[in-house]
UniProtKB/Swiss-Prot annotation:
This is tRNA-cytidine(32) 2-sulfurtransferase. It is found in: Cytoplasm. GO terms for molecular function: 4 iron, 4 sulfur cluster binding; ATP binding; magnesium ion binding; sulfurtransferase activity; tRNA binding. Catalyzes the ATP-dependent 2-thiolation of cytidine in position 32 of tRNA, to form 2-thiocytidine (s(2)C32). The sulfur atoms are provided by the cysteine/cysteine desulfurase (IscS) system. Homodimer. It is an enzyme of class 2 (transferase). The gene is ttcA. Its EC number is 2.8.1.-.
Amino acid sequence: MNAPDTLTGLEANAPVTEEAPAASEAERKRAHTRREQKEQYENNKLFKRLARQVGQAIGDFNMIEDGDKVMVCLSGGKDSYAMLDVLMRLRERAPIHFDIVAVNLDQKQPGFPEHVLPEYLSKLDIPYHIENQDTYSIVKRLVPEGKTTCSLCSRLRRGILYRVAGELGATKIALGHHRDDILQTLLLNLFYGGKLKGMPPKLQSDDGKNVVIRPLAYVKETDLEKYAELRQFPIIPCNLCGSQPNLKRAEMKALIREWDKRFPGRVDNMFNALSNVVPSHLMDHKLFPFASLRATGEADPHGDIAFDEEPCSADSASNQTQRPSQTVSFVQFDDI
């Protein structure tokens, strides 16, 4: 007696069972849309951060001026691709006019894909120049097998790029070194060179004829890795020359990554220290006249004290992790 009623109840509920997959599919679509929206939001945030940091560096150090012709050195790696990409997009909103010319030095390394950069740059519709110079053969002839060739290769490359800049009429040479490169160089000089010396954001070249700028000076390498993946740059491997890796620099890179992971704020403080130097509390008499220092008998509220407050408390560290806010005159970012 109850069986038909039970059957009828199941039949009545059957349409609901058939609609369940449709409801589930709709939910999956909504979840997919939410993921896409979140991903798009994060991507936009990443670009805005890169644009803000590059614009800040340009403004802080007056890297690019009205009428400049900026020679962007493009190696085919993630850093130089990102530098070119961000500079091109900033130029659209910059309050000044400047030109960009992309330059690649083809050093005739075995396996170098010569077609990649010309094809990529042609699509961007910007002026570019490929300089063909067989420095690879020179380096292989002069450096013993198994030794790193980076130092000699870098010197040869630098001289060629300086010459090309003059031939193209470039007023600035832009290199793709980022914040991590600067910190690695600082530690290398400190640990192995006995010098407090980093990598300047702007410098006059040793030939006195060129100004070199590093627009990525404030940018973290991890952000450049994410941006390169997002933009799907056609990356060219950097180990085609077969040189032994620079093990000391790799060691510094690993050290910085480990500190950043284990001790939040430490790497930020290290970087901030590069722009907060107190020569009177170091020991370089070329920077501060220790020999002629005398007591004046007058108090100076801004003068030195014999014993500084310990800078390693939690409050002190947290207060130093962020750079002070500064006005960026180079470009407005609100509409990016």
